[in-house]
Amino acid sequence: MDGPSTPGSRPPDYSLPSYDDHDDSPPPGHHQNINPAAIRLLTSVEGDPYDARPYVPRSPDKPSSPEHTVKPSTPSDADLYPEPLALKKDAKSTCATPEHLDALKRQEAGRVPPSPAPIDAQTAPSTHHSYQELPKPKLKPARASTVKLQKKSHSQPNLPRCAGVRASLPVIPEGPSARKSALQKSSTSCLSTPQTCPNKENSGSQSDISSAQPTQRRSYQPSIMSDYSRHDTILDPPAMPPPDSTYVPFQGRERRTPSPTRSSPTRPWSRMSNDYTRPPPSTMYEPSDLNGSPRPGTPSSRYGGSPRRPLPPAPLFSNSARDSQASFADDVTVSIPLDHDPDDVFGPETDISDNRYRKNSYVSQDTLHDDREDDYVHDDNEENDQQGHYGPAPDGKQERRGVRAPQMSRKEVQLINGELVLECKIPTILYSFLPRRDEVEFTHMRYTAVTCDPDDFVDRGYKLRQTIGRTARETELFICVTMYNETEIDFTRTMHAVMKNVAHFCSRKKSRTWGELGWQKIVVCIVSDGREKIHPRTLDALAAMGVYQDGIAKNFVNQKAVQAHVYEYTTQVSLDADLKFKGAEKGIVPCQMIFCLKEKNQRKLNSHRWFFNAFGKSLNPNVCILLDVGTRPGGDSLYHLWKAFDNDSNVAGACGEIKAMKGKFGRNLLNPLVASQNFEYKMSNILDKPLESVFGYITVLPGALSAYRYHALQNDETGHGPLSQYFKGETLHGQHADVFTANMYLAEDRILCWELVAKRDERWVLKYVKGCHGETDVPDSVPEFISQRRRWLNGAFFAAVYSLVHFKQVWTTDHTLARKILLNIESFYQLLQLLFTYFSLANFYLTFYFVAGGLADPKVDPFGNNAGFWIFTVLRYTCALLIATQFILSLGNRPQGANRLYLASMIIFVIIMMYTSFATIWIVIYQFSNDNIHLGSNVFTNIIVSVLSTLGLYVFMSLMYLEPWHLITSFVQYYLLLPFSICTLQVYAFCNTHDVTWGTKGDNVMKTDLGGAIGKRGGTTVELEIPSEQLDIDSGYDEALRNLRDRVEVHSPPPSESQLQEDYYRSVRTYMGRDLDGCQCHPRHGRQRSLFEHRHW
């Protein structure tokens, strides 16, 4: 737009005048602040380029004649400091001719000396020759008016009047002025004898001023110049930071030795200082921190945003001396310092006349490396000695530099339907990189303080965003993610997988239900059980996604205790398991999220009551999916789960395949506990779930990955139904909460499955979806594994008893006769399985007794010398004593307090199982080496057929499913840990049927740490403390990001002294009981009868 420009066609620091037809001068008092981000709007430019002729540099040893100086026609700031070589166009100005260009070239070469012509008062002094010597130029057509951002005057130029004004100006004398002569003389003297030049510490007199290049004469020089009233010139040298500065200047240019006749161009903002002091941070730019990163901003930042937002890097040769006075007015003349500063040039101990704006020459920069450098270092050492030591470092946690603590202010807020509902702006950084900002759901987070029971959520008038305003939508899929105290890694693993599944729904373009806007039909609800139990880093992850903001929640509203804090936001970013942001560039689509943070810890069943009875009743979804934090569903698992309901209208519930998380390259399988659970999960998904799906009744839909049809869960007109039975265990208190019911509701998902299938006058079935799979983290330590299985075994046992007792309900349903018969067959199968589980401990001991005792026979003894008999005798008494020890441990010790005892028991059981397996293999080999093999043989039937019917079934079904890898990686671990699972887990579960508490004691006290909303004006408004401004919201967001980036660990509180002492006393009691029991055992003398002697057993 400015026309072609070639290197060297313009002088350094040359800038075109404003795009206008007239001379624009700002109004009085207008700040001409140099803004690097300023934008000039230009719509049309006609005519030749403004700066058409090339720039010819002048000879530095010859001062320019006064005829060459152009004076502006309007008194403004530019009059005080005219721009070098910036020519103003006028209506009568002449253009450059070939003759004129030739004369300039000859003048540069020294062939033709300059011959200034006399100045006529009626002609514009804009050329080097008189108007009569040049040919008459060809007039150009008038330019069209340009559009600009500043307001301009519409008056046309009056050329005769301008000529009269120029005629009234005083005649400029020829030759250099006295001030310029002094400058040149000072520069010459410093170059000739640098040692004799004055060298003051903070000198600001004109004697120190030297210039490497002559400039135009200034008509006015103020006594004290403010930073904003001064225009930059080419005389400003580049700033050289002191050695202790962390900002490294630009090194791209070739640094040359300055001379009076040659000087490298500088930046218009460059300033320099001879002081070895760190410049104060500016409001616009700040130097890098100790790590080389941009220093966070301050509240006085020009961005007005977060104090932790990184500012842009400083410009080339930047210095903060100019910006240090930004708080003063533009027309300031004398600044009154608030505190005494020895470096303040306007301080009380300095003379104002000697501290004008300094322009140091290049010579002063070069002398930094000569003999005077020692003087500087000596002065700095003396100054440090005078100041003394700063003292010892402060103790304790220090406030991070540049951080602005969030400030709270009391504000009066209008209540909505008598309840506290706030619309909070999202942090500025999060808003800056959002792809969509067109709706309030993207720009504001909605907070609701719920003060009622979840069953009364809708009746009390609470609303969700999906039911009000422009965001009112139909919900097809409602996803529940329950959480307790899981870490941010577990949360982000699950949440990122859910958001990828939402993106998969939107990618199905041909679907009649889904498509590009499919995310509007999906709502994700996160329910956290207990505000004081949630992991702080998990809150930081939610805050990073924009769902949560600290400082908004309150404990009570109008003297009513808050039961749950509900946050609503449609996020467009996700955090993966590595805590890295993923957005639209990775295929992430918007996701409607509801975060329900319960005030009290009331167990998982209460979380589901909030999900179904509060939020589900408000949204009325079609399908509800239940997930646990830590479970990672596959990329399209949720779609396959939803598709099962879409294909069959009789499906009331469905589940997918749960896999144990094996880690990278399967390294988690090196832990025997993880490997055994992996084999157990795989065989359950291969044998149990498909068989139960054929019958139509799956005994348990795992809460880690399952789905239900919301319509099928509803109660009938009398209030009886699946949900009423499901939440019955939460409302049982006192004498009504019997032990049987309390343990049964430890596995409440089993009760829900039975109530769905046996619902009166309905024909609902449950289905297993093979295409849906999810990975979950399994316990990897013995105490955690025992505690988890205690709830599972007790819940499964009592729920199976419940379904067997109420099996007659099947005949009241609307199922077909064939389906009813199949359900009764399945009930009989469950009865057999229940009996086998109940007597599994005796079955294990009998198996060990007869199989391992088979090696006690001298005919089969592989060791000889009757060694098999003695080995079996030792293991027999060890096994009996170990089983008795499990009862003592289960009745008196916690798994966390008796970790060593349980670990020792597991090792001994593994040894016993290894010897039993060896005995089995040896007996099978011995039988095949004998010719008397027939099917009626007791040994052949009891050993070989039983082994083939169990292990062979595992191998055959795994090969049929084309998934045999768990047989290779996990079968051995599972087989060896079978005695530990049968004896230890089974005994501990039945010995702790009284333990049905979830640690909710003392949660009935209302907390006041968050503050409250106090009612005003008859209860229509409340007064509460909230963040005072946007900067406080940004500070909390930056704090959350820093915690996630630094991976700040949250240490769990150690066990109390009383708990440790109690565990110690219980361990001593267990040792005494074990020793007493062992001392009463006496071995029976005599030869052990082997299995081969019991021919008719």
Curated annotation (Swiss-Prot):
GO terms for biological process: chitin biosynthetic process; mitotic actomyosin contractile ring contraction. Its EC number is 2.4.1.16. Keywords: Cell membrane, Glycoprotein, Glycosyltransferase, Membrane, Transferase, Transmembrane, Transmembrane helix, Virulence. Its main location: membrane. It is found in: Cell membrane. It catalyses: [(1->4)-N-acetyl-beta-D-glucosaminyl](n) + UDP-N-acetyl-alpha-D-glucosamine = [(1->4)-N-acetyl-beta-D-glucosaminyl](n+1) + UDP + H(+). GO terms for molecular function: chitin synthase activity. Disruption phenotype: Exhibits a significant reduced pathogenicity in Arabidopsis and cotton plants. The chain crosses the membrane at residues 792-812, 834-854, 869-889, 906-926, 939-959, 965-985. Residues 59-70, 99-109 have a biased composition (Basic and acidic residues). Residues 258-271 have a biased composition (Low complexity). Residues 183-226, 317-327 have a biased composition (Polar residues). Glycans are attached at N485, N647. It is a multi-pass membrane protein. GO terms for cellular component: cell septum; cellular bud neck; plasma membrane. It comes from the Eukaryota. Residues 372-385 have a biased composition (Acidic residues). The keyword Glycosyltransferase applies. Residues 1-407 are annotated as: Disordered. Belongs to the chitin synthase family. Class II subfamily. Polymerizes chitin, a structural polymer of the cell wall and septum, by transferring the sugar moiety of UDP-GlcNAc to the non-reducing end of the growing chitin polymer. Plays a role in cell wall integrity. Plays a key role in pathogenicity. Likely contributes to post-penetration virulence. This is Chitin synthase 2.
